[in-house]
Structures are given as C-alpha cells and as structure tokens.
C-alpha cells in the first residue's frame, strides 16, 4: 500500500480559540493548494483519506483538491502514533492519505521512515509536512518515496 502521512497545514493561533475549531491561516491555505499540485505532478492519487475531524485538518484536505473518498474521524484528533497505526491497519485501500496532528503523525512518520530520510526538516515535521512511503506488513518492508514541506514547494 502507498501511504501518505501529512500534518495539517499551518493554522491560526489566536488566544481564546478552541483548538479543535482552529482554521487554517492564509499561509496554510496556500500550502494545502501547493501540496495538492505537488500530489498531481507526482501522480500521488489517494484512493481513501482518513482525516482528523478538526477544522484545520478538514480544510487541509479540501485544499488539496482531491477526488478520493474521505472519512473524518474524531479518533484522529490529537491521536498518538499507536492510534494512527491502528486506523491505518483497518484501511484496505491502494493509496491511503492520513491527515492528522503532531506529535502523533510525526512519531509515526519517524518510525516508518527510520533513518532513510536526510531532509533537514523531517524531524521537526512542521505544518504541511508530507511523507510518502510504500508500506509493507511491518516497518522492515517500508520504503520512502518522498518527503516535502510546504517551503520545499515555493518556486
């Protein structure tokens, strides 16, 4: 299975706003569009998306402009790497996109990619970070295709 692990794009951070309802910032909206264009140029075509039910993750998915089915899951909101892995294992699809939050999405990405990635921002996993891998039954069968942050896509 092809697996795409994406941290939501940059969100607004205003005092007093409930975390779950935070929207994307203008930068985050542009980043989601840029990532969607990158998906298209690389022929990354998710057949299913599992997305946290927070506003910023939903908006990140919508910004990608993908046509795949999507499931907005409350269980992915601030999910641990273990919870994310559990949801991924339930999915039976050819190319799965998961959009979630740090630290869980970053921890899972680091576990699956191992030491194969030398990108200077990989361990920070900033907003919009996206890892694309071929996932086998266990971590030893995983190979990295690509990793990008929104900053990598600015021309």
Regions found by a protein language model. Give the residues of each.
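Conserved histidine-centered catalytic loops in small-molecule metabolism enzymes
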Residues: 46-69, 111, 136-155
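Glycine-rich phosphate-binding loop signature in dinucleotide/nucleotide-binding domains
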Residues: 42-44, 90-94
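Short amphipathic alpha-helix with an adjacent loop that forms part of the alpha/beta core around
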Residues: 83-91
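Active-site-proximal alpha-helix that buttresses catalytic centers in soluble enzyme cores
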Residues: 2-82, 106, 117, 125-128
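Domain-level recognition of soluble alpha/beta enzyme cores
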Residues: 116-143, 150-151
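Short, solvent-exposed polar/charged micro-motifs at secondary-structure junctions
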Residues: 81-83, 154-155
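Non-DNA-binding regulatory cores of transcription-related proteins
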Residues: 93, 97, 102-129
